[in-house]
Amino acid sequence: MNKAVFLDRDGVINDNYKPVNRPQDLKLYPWSAQSILHLNTAGYYVFIVTNQGGIEMGYFKEKDLNEIHIKLLKEIEKAGANIDEIEFCPHFRTKCNCRKPSPGMIKKLAEKYNINLQSSFMIGDRDVDIEAGIKAGCKTIKIGKSYKKADYTVENLLEAVKIILQ
């Protein structure tokens, strides 16, 4: 079985100072691509699992989200890094099993890529990210303010990667 790191997007890979509704709103943190490259080199699959309820609420369309993700992937690839797949939940009010804190997106990717969730990590900046990781059976790393349920709490993705690779 394979090991993976599941990343939330906003607040982990890119700045979330304002909503990312268009490609020009996406501002990657300077350490993101290098952090992902370290994970790639260590043999981890790297996935993004992101709640994008703005689609259901009408702030942007799935086409816009695809353009944002194309830009994100191009910027990551410039550094030689790779995101294996991006999974998103477009729901906000609709009941579903994909919107975090549900583990649906993580479990879907784990099944598709034969991932051992017990040897994998979920990294997020919100409590719902950590709860999704726990429900999926991953180790969890919270970025920013401490959350007692998380296995680790760090300042940014680069620090999280150092924990994973130690």
Regions found by a protein language model. Give the residues of each.
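Gly/Ser/Thr-rich beta-alpha loop segments that engage phosphate groups in nucleotides
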Residues: 13, 56, 60, 126
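A short alpha-helix capping/helix-coil boundary motif
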Residues: 13-16, 51-53, 84-85, 107-110
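A short acidic, helix-capping loop that chelates divalent metal ions and anchors anionic groups
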Residues: 17, 21-22, 54-59, 92-97, ...
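Substrate-recognition element of Asp-dependent hydrolases with the DxDx(T/V) motif
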Residues: 32, 36-69, 83-94, 133
